[in-house]
């Protein structure tokens, strides 16, 4: 970044913002880059601001029992805030004084007041000086207040982030990631732009008092008629606002439902295509969209009338102020025009400035209170460890994740019992729990000596991870003692990769040791992977390591833990994503040899690992089932395998239910606090559905559980969670993106958090931060790929993983709205900022406007209709003004009249009443025409939005994966959330406002041109100057806004990344380093935002300067060229003031329209995406004249002989696959054939291309070559017909929000009897029957009430229903409990006995059932043989299979031993002094 010219700028340059000219010039000529942005001054750095506020907040905490954050903010920013407030007030006062001088100028033209004619020129100079002073006061004041707001936001951003890193895990379990993002985005952004309005809470009343005093001088008591009307108007607008909020609240649930389905579709787009569900998903989403649009139209109409009321209230304000006085005493034209000018200022103060200021204070204080509550939450406390001990001891330890479960329910019962009058659907109250206070660990005892290996085993949900968390201090024991050294290293179950290089991820801030580093790389089998990268271990890994395979991420995470020298290593299932051979080698070389002298606790379920362990601890439902050696285990616990694997009395479903349903229901209905909230608020927070969908949804909270752990639900009054919650005051459609995506360039949108299914949907779905930390990094990342496909790994679908801490058991899409890495290096930031924005120009093109107008034919006619009505309004205005300027004037001739009454007066005799009759008639006509002329426009623009949404949805569903792979899920979802919200809500009203303002300006210019042609001549160059200035500024401002939006994403990405790796961060003590990274991300955003604010103020000030010059010209032209007659001068000067203020507004509105039209550009870009599918060759009918057999794939009534595929024979010839057109080949020249009914196993190391091959079979990639099924080539039939030949069970199970029936049969092709029959076959009937409604039970949030095994069975049922002859299975047993795995094996043998099965699997026992094996190495087929031949040769399969398995297969063979591995000596321990910086 460059040094800012602001540092050396003069006072004049700072006052007029001239120091921004270099960046404006550069932005106009070329595209701006990050390197062009100026560095921020030190006073704006996050380090300084956060330190300042943190110091004051600590002081507040120390000095008071009830600390207030607002006091800390006041001590930091109050005096500067008030300083600029005074300047703002003085600027507003000049607006009130201007009409006085205008009145004097008009009065000087009265024929009876010729002595003042000589001073008219001086009055004109004074009026112009007032405009100059106002400009010089207002703009620096507004900029200063924006600057203070920015500093407050930065300081609180930092404070919140630092607090987040200190929060206890129990607190994190109760806070959703959506709440945190809302806290940082929704609430804090109120300070950025709202602070300038805050002063109007006291300025506006003073302004009104001053104006009413001045108007009283003119009109006496009748002045209050106009004020009364304005107050009534403000109340009317408030009523309309409440009505609009009611419609928006109703609409919120519909938008939520649509975005839930849309987000699930986007995250699982590969599965949608594999199942051929494109049409079903499109129909489902469009049905929800129809309901949503009905409410959208109602809200838009109300908002339209609200906006129109302000535009057309001016007639009545002036009319009601003037009419009573005129009827009683008569009135002079000077008073009319002066009153008009006063009323313009008064209307703005009463109906806009004061309500906005009150709302700003309300929102800001609410935000401060939420942040204050958050900052006072319980912090993580490191346990007091004995640093001299060498052993690890637990004595009678018991722990709860939920602190005081029993107390929580007792409190809930008490609160509900106190509300005996409540009934109905208000909330849910739980009773009859046998789960009260269930500990996650109970009475745990063990002791291991230094250098020993403890293997911790147990079924899913037994408490293995909780045990490690307790040792780390994340989970505090409620009873018992823990003793060990504080030098801990930790490897999480789900690998966490921070943005940075591979080397940085492994070293992780520990001092670099070349020998140690190389030894760890070798032991973790990373040498070969690193050698494939051009940059070796210096390759920059993006967000979450998305360019790496799951196995590569797991090995890097393990290497990080091993590299740190510690006394105790905690390894939580580190081998979950590794193939059998790699796992075996790493366990031997790394865990057993490299770390031989270290104390290790390994969570595992592998028998080979238990045999090698010094001690074994088996957990069952939180209790210690066994502790001892392996030999003791065999003697004392012969049934240990059932407890270990979960095949006996352990209920997999109930364990998951304990951790997901109970906690989720607690979160959903927030039974922690006391404050009652309305049902609508509860509905917003709980993501509850409405209508028929919602009625079913009520039942979905229940869970089929075994009889021991049932609970009942009673309807009671709701409770609300204390502390932070989602901003229920913010209408949903204004929250439609968690974080603006990197393309966003809106100049007018408040930067608030809005739904995007990443954290936005999470905000609605109450995804806890603890769940975020314990969830698979693979989730949702299949679409999150960069363009460089060479290092990309695709699986058939990303994996879904569950742990005992998976509190909500919901799919997680945190990446969808957070697209940019927080890496700080500027060059790396360019990499991370990649998005599809390059093809969207900085300024919206005319082609986009033309295309938008022609989307709906009616829009052109509506625009013509608006123009016709406008011409009628101009004609009516001319009539009124002609009457005012040319009314016959009479002199009452009474010498006793006051001086005011000696002026020319509009006499109120009967002969002159016609003036007011005509005025009222014209005003009513204009009001009626103005009110209704925009309705057809708003209605038609919403229809255009509906059409564009439909086209975009269709395009995304039909787009090839090669195109979707280059897009980020967040970018796609933002099109459907934020951009569609803009098209629905903001764009129609903004276009209406712009057209309205433009027509007002044109009409006023037309009137002035008739009255004074000289002024028209002066107007033309001014308008030209405005247009040129707008074009000049727009080029730079949109680019700066773009960069600012991009700079915002790393902030939120860094927050989510930090939360995902929080346990690792704390274990390694890297919080200060990540705070530094966060501050750098904040500083980067600040540099862009500050520059944008500065250039915006430069533009606004230049507009004001042009206006001042124009007004000076108009004033002197009218004074020098007008002869007698005050009417003409009054009209000209009043209209001149209105023309320029309205023209300024129109120019700003045009910038807003251009910004919003960028959303339209992005939507068009998605609509223009290519569609997938190659042109098919023509197929010839059979000899009997029937249609081609490939056309009757779905027809169950056709004779079996004609159904395709009939056998499942598959021939692959020279198959080559690529992720993108023209990219590197990821599979090359694959050729083999499969006989009907044969089972083929895919073998290969992690990342070799096994899952990619399955994707290629489904034509999800760019492919070359040919595949035939039963003699039919894939080129001869459509894509849909080809994919329907396959049944698919992907890695990541796709369960969308809907009923069981919809999930199994979305096209509604099968009867209930057939569905139940299949459910019986796959073992799902007993599960489905336990739910209310059975097949009609609504699954939500990725099927959170189902275990992972049940979800896999759902996929199996889909394949059985599809009658597919070829079944593709991609890691079906990954993270499955053995019960579900055995059901899948049995179903495969029975239901798919005659089908061709292609299996990609890591479990040896599953692979042994295959007849043929396809071995893939380096993207090519190395072997394709039977199991006998592979065992005879030195193959991967032979190395992977254990001798015992070989004996089981072929007892008559002697299993040969594997090649000995190179010895790796254990690392010597480092001294105490060398590891001080890594200690907790």
UniProtKB/Swiss-Prot annotation:
<feature type="lipid moiety-binding region" description="S-palmitoyl cysteine">
    <location>
        <position position="1395"/>
    </location>
</feature>
<dbReference type="GO" id="GO:0070175">
    <property type="term" value="P:positive regulation of enamel mineralization"/>
</dbReference>
<feature type="transmembrane region" description="Helical; Name=9">
    <location>
        <begin position="991"/>
        <end position="1011"/>
    </location>
</feature>
<dbReference type="GO" id="GO:0042626">
    <property type="term" value="F:ATPase-coupled transmembrane transporter activity"/>
</dbReference>
<feature type="region of interest" description="Disordered R region">
    <location>
        <begin position="654"/>
        <end position="831"/>
    </location>
</feature>
<keyword id="KW-0406">Ion transport</keyword>
<feature type="transmembrane region" description="Helical; Name=12">
    <location>
        <begin position="1131"/>
        <end position="1151"/>
    </location>
</feature>
<dbReference type="GO" id="GO:0031901">
    <property type="term" value="C:early endosome membrane"/>
</dbReference>
<dbReference type="Pfam" id="PF00664">
    <property type="entry name" value="ABC_membrane"/>
</dbReference>
<feature type="modified residue" description="Phosphothreonine">
    <location>
        <position position="717"/>
    </location>
</feature>
<dbReference type="GO" id="GO:0034707">
    <property type="term" value="C:chloride channel complex"/>
</dbReference>
<dbReference type="InterPro" id="IPR011527">
    <property type="entry name" value="ABC1_TM_dom"/>
</dbReference>
<feature type="modified residue" description="Phosphoserine">
    <location>
        <position position="1456"/>
    </location>
</feature>
<feature type="topological domain" description="Extracellular">
    <location>
        <begin position="217"/>
        <end position="222"/>
    </location>
</feature>
<keyword id="KW-0564">Palmitate</keyword>
<feature type="modified residue" description="Phosphoserine">
    <location>
        <position position="813"/>
    </location>
</feature>
<feature type="topological domain" description="Extracellular">
    <location>
        <begin position="1117"/>
        <end position="1130"/>
    </location>
</feature>
<keyword id="KW-0449">Lipoprotein</keyword>
<dbReference type="GO" id="GO:0071320">
    <property type="term" value="P:cellular response to cAMP"/>
</dbReference>
<dbReference type="GO" id="GO:0015108">
    <property type="term" value="F:chloride transmembrane transporter activity"/>
</dbReference>
<keyword id="KW-0256">Endoplasmic reticulum</keyword>
<feature type="modified residue" description="Phosphoserine">
    <location>
        <position position="712"/>
    </location>
</feature>
<keyword id="KW-0539">Nucleus</keyword>
<keyword id="KW-0413">Isomerase</keyword>
<dbReference type="GO" id="GO:0005886">
    <property type="term" value="C:plasma membrane"/>
</dbReference>
<feature type="binding site">
    <location>
        <position position="434"/>
    </location>
    <ligand>
        <name>ATP 1</name>
    </ligand>
</feature>
<feature type="binding site">
    <location>
        <position position="401"/>
    </location>
    <ligand>
        <name>ATP 1</name>
    </ligand>
</feature>
<feature type="modified residue" description="Phosphoserine">
    <location>
        <position position="768"/>
    </location>
</feature>
<dbReference type="Pfam" id="PF14396">
    <property type="entry name" value="CFTR_R"/>
</dbReference>
<dbReference type="GO" id="GO:0071889">
    <property type="term" value="F:14-3-3 protein binding"/>
</dbReference>
<feature type="transmembrane region" description="Helical; Name=10">
    <location>
        <begin position="1014"/>
        <end position="1034"/>
    </location>
</feature>
<feature type="transmembrane region" description="Helical; Name=11">
    <location>
        <begin position="1096"/>
        <end position="1116"/>
    </location>
</feature>
<feature type="region of interest" description="Interaction with GORASP2">
    <location>
        <begin position="1386"/>
        <end position="1480"/>
    </location>
</feature>
<keyword id="KW-1003">Cell membrane</keyword>
<feature type="domain" description="ABC transmembrane type-1 2">
    <location>
        <begin position="859"/>
        <end position="1155"/>
    </location>
</feature>
<dbReference type="GO" id="GO:1902476">
    <property type="term" value="P:chloride transmembrane transport"/>
</dbReference>
<feature type="transmembrane region" description="Helical; Name=7">
    <location>
        <begin position="859"/>
        <end position="879"/>
    </location>
</feature>
<feature type="transmembrane region" description="Helical; Name=4">
    <location>
        <begin position="223"/>
        <end position="243"/>
    </location>
</feature>
<dbReference type="GO" id="GO:0051649">
    <property type="term" value="P:establishment of localization in cell"/>
</dbReference>
<dbReference type="InterPro" id="IPR025837">
    <property type="entry name" value="CFTR_reg_dom"/>
</dbReference>
<feature type="topological domain" description="Extracellular">
    <location>
        <begin position="99"/>
        <end position="122"/>
    </location>
</feature>
<dbReference type="GO" id="GO:0016887">
    <property type="term" value="F:ATP hydrolysis activity"/>
</dbReference>
């Amino acid at each position: 970044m460059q040094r800012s010219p602001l540092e050396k700028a003069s006072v004049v340059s700072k006052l007029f913002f001239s120091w921004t000219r270099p960046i404006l010039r550069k932005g106009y000529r070329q595209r701006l880059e990050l390197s062009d942005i100026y560095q921020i001054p030190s006073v704006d750095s996050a380090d300084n601001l956060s330190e300042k506020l943190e110091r004051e907040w600590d002081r507040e905490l120390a000095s008071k029992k009830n600390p207030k954050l607002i006091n800390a903010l006041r001590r930091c920013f109050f005096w500067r805030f008030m300083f600029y407030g005074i300047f703002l007030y003085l600027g507003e006062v000049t607006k009130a004084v201007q009409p006085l001088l205008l009145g004097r100028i008009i009065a000087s033209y009265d024929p009876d007041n010729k002595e003042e004619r000589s001073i008219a020129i001086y009055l004109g100079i004074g009026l112009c000086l007032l405009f100059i002073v106002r400009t010089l006061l207002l703009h620096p004041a507004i900029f200063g207040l924006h600057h203070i707001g920015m500093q407050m936001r930065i300081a609180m951003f930092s404070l919140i982030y630092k607090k987040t890193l200190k929060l206890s895990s129990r607190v994190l379990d109760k806070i959703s990631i959506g709440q945190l993002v809302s806290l940082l985005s929704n609430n804090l952004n109120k300070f950025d732009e709202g602070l300038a309005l805050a002063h109007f809470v006291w300025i506006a009343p003073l302004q009104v008092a001053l104006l009413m005093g001045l108007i009283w001088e003119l009109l006496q008591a009748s002045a209050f008629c106009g004020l009364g009307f304005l107050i009534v108007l403000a109340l009317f607008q408030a009523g309309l606002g409440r009505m609009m909020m009611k419609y928006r609240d109703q609409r919120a649930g519909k938008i939520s439902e649509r975005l839930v389905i849309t987000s699930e579709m986007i995250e699982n787009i590969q599965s949608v295509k594999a199942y051929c569900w494109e049409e079903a998903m499109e129909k489902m989403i469009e049905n929800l969209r129809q309901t949503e649009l009905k409410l959208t139209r109602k809200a838009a109409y109300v908002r339209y009338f609200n906006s129109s009321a302000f535009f057309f209230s001016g007639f009545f304000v002036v009319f009601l102020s003037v009419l009573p006085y005129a009827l009683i005493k008569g009135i002079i034209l000077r008073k009319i025009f002066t009153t008009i000018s006063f009323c313009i200022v008064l209307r703005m103060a009463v109906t806009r400035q004061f309500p906005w200021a009150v709302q700003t204070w309300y929102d800001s204080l609410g935000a401060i209170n939420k942040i204050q509550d958050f900052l006072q939450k319980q912090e993580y406390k490191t346990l007091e460890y004995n640093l001299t001990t060498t052993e690890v001891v637990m004595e009678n330890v018991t722990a709860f994740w939920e602190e005081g479960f029993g107390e929580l329910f007792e409190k809930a019962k008490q609160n509900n019992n106190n509300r005996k009058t409540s009934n109905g659907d208000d909330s849910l109250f739980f009773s009859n729990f046998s789960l009260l206070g269930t500990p996650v660990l109970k009475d745990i005892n063990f002791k291991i000596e230094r250098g020993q290996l403890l293997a911790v085993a147990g079924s899913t949900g037994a408490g293995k991870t909780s045990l490690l968390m307790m040792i780390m201090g994340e989970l505090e024991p409620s009873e018992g003692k823990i003793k060990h050294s504080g030098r801990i290293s930790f490897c999480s179950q789900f690998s966490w990769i921070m943005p940075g290089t591979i080397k940085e991820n492994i070293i992780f801030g520990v001092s670099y040791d070349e020998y140690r580093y190389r030894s760890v790389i070798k032991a973790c089998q990373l040498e070969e992977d690193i050698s494939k990268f051009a940059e070796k271990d210096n390759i920059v890994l993006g967000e979450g390591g998305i360019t790496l395979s799951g196995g590569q991420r797991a090995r890097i995470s393990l290497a990080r833990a091993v590299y740190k020298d510690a006394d105790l290593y905690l390894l939580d299932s580190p081998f979950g994503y590794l193939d059998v051979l790699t796992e075996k080698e790493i366990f031997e070389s790394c865990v057993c040899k490299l770390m031989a002298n270290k104390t290790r606790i390994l969570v595992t379920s592998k028998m080979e690992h238990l045999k090698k362990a010094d001690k074994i601890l088996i957990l069952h439902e939180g209790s210690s089932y066994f502790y001892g050696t392996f030999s003791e285990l065999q003697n004392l616990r012969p049934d240990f395998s059932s407890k270990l694997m979960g095949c006996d009395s352990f209920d997999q479903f109930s364990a998951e239910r304990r951790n997901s349903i109970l906690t989720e229901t607690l979160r959903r209905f927030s039974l922690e606090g006391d404050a009652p909230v309305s049902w609508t608020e509860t509905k917003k927070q709980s993501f509850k559905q409405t209508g028929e969908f919602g009625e079913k949804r009520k039942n979905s909270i229940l869970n089929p559980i075994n009889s021991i752990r049932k609970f009942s639900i009673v309807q009671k009054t709701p409770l609300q969670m204390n502390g932070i919650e989602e901003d229920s005051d913010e209408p949903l459609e204004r929250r439609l993106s968690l974080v603006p995506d990197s393309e966003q360039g809106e100049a007018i949108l408040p930067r608030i958090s809005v739904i995007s299914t990443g954290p936005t949907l999470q905000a609605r779905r109450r995804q806890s931060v603890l769940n975020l930390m314990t969830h698979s990094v693979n989730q949702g990342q299949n679409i999150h790929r960069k363009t460089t496909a060479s290092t990309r790994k695709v699986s058939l679908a990303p994996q879904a993983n569950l742990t005992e801490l998976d509190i909500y058991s919901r799919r997680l899409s945190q990446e969808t709205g957070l697209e940019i890495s927080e890496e700080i290096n500027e060059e790396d930031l360019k990499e991370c900022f990649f998005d599809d924005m390059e093809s969207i120009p900085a300024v919206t093109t005319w082609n986009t406007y033309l295309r938008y107008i022609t989307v709906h034919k009616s829009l052109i006619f509506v625009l013509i209709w608006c123009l016709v009505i406008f011409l009628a309004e101009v004609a009516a205005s001319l009539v009124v003004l002609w009457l005012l300027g040319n009314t016959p004037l009479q002199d009452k001739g009474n010498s006793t009249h006051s001086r005011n009454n000696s002026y020319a007066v509009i006499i109120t005799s009967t002969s002159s009443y016609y003036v007011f009759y005509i005025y009222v008639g014209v005003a009513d006509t204009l009001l009626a025409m103005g009110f209704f002329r925009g309705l057809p426009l708003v209605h038609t623009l919403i229809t255009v939005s509906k059409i564009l949404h439909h086209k975009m949805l269709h395009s995304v569903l039909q787009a090839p994966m090669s195109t979707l792979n280059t897009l980020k899920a967040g970018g796609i979802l933002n099109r459907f959330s934020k951009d569609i919200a803009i098209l629905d809500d903001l764009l129609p009203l903004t276009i209406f406002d712009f057209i309205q303002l433009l027509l007002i300006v044109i009409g006023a210019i037309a009137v002035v041109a008739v009255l004074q042609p000289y002024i028209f001549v002066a107007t033309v160059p001014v308008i030209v100057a405005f247009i040129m200035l707008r074009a000049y500024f727009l080029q730079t401002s949109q680019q700066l806004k773009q960069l600012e939006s991009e700079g915002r994403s790393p902030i939120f990405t860094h927050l989510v990344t930090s939360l995902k790796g929080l346990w690792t961060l704390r274990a390694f003590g890297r919080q200060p380093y990540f705070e530094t990274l966060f501050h750098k991300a904040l500083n980067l955003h600040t540099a862009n935002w500050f520059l944008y604010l500065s250039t915006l103020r430069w533009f606004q000030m230049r507009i004001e300067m042009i206006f001042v010059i124009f007004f000076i010209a108009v004033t002197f032209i009218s004074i020098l060229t007008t002869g007698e007659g005050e009417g003409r001068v009054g009209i000209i000067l009043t209209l001149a003031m209105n023309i320029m203020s309205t023209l300024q507004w129109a120019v700003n509105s045009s910038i807003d329209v251009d910004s919003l039209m960028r959303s339209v550009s992005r939507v068009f870009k998605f609509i223009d995406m290519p569609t997938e599918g190659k042109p098919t060759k023509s197929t010839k009918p059979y000899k009997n004249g029937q249609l081609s057999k490939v056309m009757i794939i779905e027809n169950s009534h056709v004779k079996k002989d004609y159904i395709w595929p009939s056998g499942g024979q598959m021939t692959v010839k020279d198959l080559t696959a690529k992720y993108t057109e023209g990219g590197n080949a990821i599979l090359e020249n694959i050729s083999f054939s499969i006989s009907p009914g044969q089972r083929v196993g895919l073998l290969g190391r992690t990342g070799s291309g096994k899952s990619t091959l399955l994707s290629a079979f489904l034509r999800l990639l760019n492919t070359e070559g040919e595949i035939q099924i039963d003699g039919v080539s894939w080129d001869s039939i459509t894509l849909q017909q080809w994919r329907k030949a396959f049944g698919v069970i992907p890695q990541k199970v796709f369960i969308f929000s809907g009923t069981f029936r919809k999930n199994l049969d979305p096209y509604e092709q099968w009867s209930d009897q057939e569905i139940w029959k299949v459910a019986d076959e796959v073992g799902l009937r007993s599960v489905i029957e336990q739910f209310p409604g059975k097949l009609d039970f609504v699954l939500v949030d990725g099927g959170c009430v189902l275990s992972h095994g049940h979800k896999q069975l759902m996929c199996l049922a889909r394949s059985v229903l599809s009658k597919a002859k070829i079944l593709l299975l991609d890691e079906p047993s990954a993270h499955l409990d053995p019960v579900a795995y055995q059901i899948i094996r049995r179903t495969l043998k029975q239901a798919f006995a005659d089908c061709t099965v292609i299996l990609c699997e890591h479990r040896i026992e599953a692979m042994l059932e295959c007849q043929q094996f396809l071995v893939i190495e380096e993207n090519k087929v190395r072997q394709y043989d039977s199991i006998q031949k592979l065992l005879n040769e030195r193959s991967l399969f032979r190395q992977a299979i254990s001798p015992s398995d070989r004996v089981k297969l072929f007892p008559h063979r002697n299993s040969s031993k594997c090649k000995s591995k190179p010895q790796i000596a254990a690392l010597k321990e480092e001294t105490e002094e060398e590891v001080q910086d890594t200690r907790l």
